[in-house]
Amino acid sequence: MSEEKETIKERSSGFISVRDIPGVGSSIADKLEAAGYLSAWSIVVARAEELAERTGLPVLTVQKIIENARKMLGITFKTAREVKQERSNIGKITTGSKSLDELLGGGVETKTITEFFGEYGSGKTQICHQLSVNVQLTPEKGGLNGRAVYIDTEGTFRWERIEAMARALGLDPDKVMDNIYYMRAYNSDHQIAIVDELFTFVPKNDVRLVILDSVTSHFRAEYPGREHLAERQQKLNSHLHQLMRLAEAYNVAVVVTNQVMARPDVFYGDPTTAVGGHVLAHTPGVRIQLRKSKGNKRIARVVDAPHLPEGEVVFVITEEGIRDSEEE
């Protein structure tokens, strides 16, 4: 590997300030940071129009800054082997179930959006609670030594579950809860604003996991009927891409939950489908469907993931958290 490529790798794996971007002086850096753009990677994944609007800088200036940031970080054509090497920087969070981890290719990945969708009681929120605890574990135990952000749109977050899951892992419940930043989102605009704020909050607080439970509930309630469908989908699409940029810019795992709705045109097989249509179907890197089974058993199935084979596993929800089923 050349000296230039070694430098690129070092830069891409760590935090590089916007002040390190060539051509960015202190006054411009102040404006970028005030708007929530702290790292060079946050500039790379930003849209020029949005960056100009939020900073008050001219579009031409912003375009040059983005171009310089991309050159500095080596954002150019890469060989497949180089892409493979870069994936070694991706972290994975255990779900608490070995079989579910294997289905996910080793756990919930950073730098991507993982969606869990299913009917009420299928285990979506339970998995979110477990991940917010497990991300705090050491890498040897399946964590990332990081903190979690939990955005709750339906009021389903329960600190009692966090305590129980922490104790089951031999962790101090109070310390675990101190490392989970909770925010209740009251409508879709509030939800979008919270995610925008995370571009400043995440790098300052060692956050490695962002949970949004659920991503579609407010959009679905506020934009009912076909007459509002186009507006809803456009707004949801922009929101999902903001989450994707967040995951890629700061190497964090983004987990969203989603509801299901009935499909009246389906007479055989599963008559439900995830809410959000094609917009949500094409954005998350990994889509997992959850279904109820007997008792505390749940079934997880890979619906879409470019790097994972199709398959399904059984796991259980216990008082201690997400665990393997005896059947597996």
From Swiss-Prot:
Coiled coil: none annotated. It comes from the Archaea. InterPro entries: AAA+_ATPase, DNA_recomb/repair_Rad51_C, DNA_recomb/repair_RadA, DNA_recomb/repair_RecA-like, DNA_repair_Rad51/TF_NusA_a-hlx, P-loop_NTPase, RecA_ATP-bd, RecA_monomer-monomer_interface. GO terms for biological process: DNA recombination; DNA repair. Pfam families: Rad51. GO terms for molecular function: ATP binding; ATP hydrolysis activity; ATP-dependent DNA damage sensor activity; damaged DNA binding. ATP binds at G118, E119, Y120, G121, S122, G123, K124, T125. Keywords: ATP-binding, DNA damage, DNA recombination, DNA-binding, Nucleotide-binding. CDD domains: archRadA (cd19515). SUPFAM superfamilies: P-loop containing nucleoside triphosphate hydrolases, Rad51 N-terminal domain-like. NCBIfam families: PRK04301.1, recomb_radA. Involved in DNA repair and in homologous recombination. Binds and assemble on single-stranded DNA to form a nucleoprotein filament. Hydrolyzes ATP in a ssDNA-dependent manner and promotes DNA strand exchange between homologous DNA molecules. Belongs to the eukaryotic RecA-like protein family. This is DNA repair and recombination protein RadA.
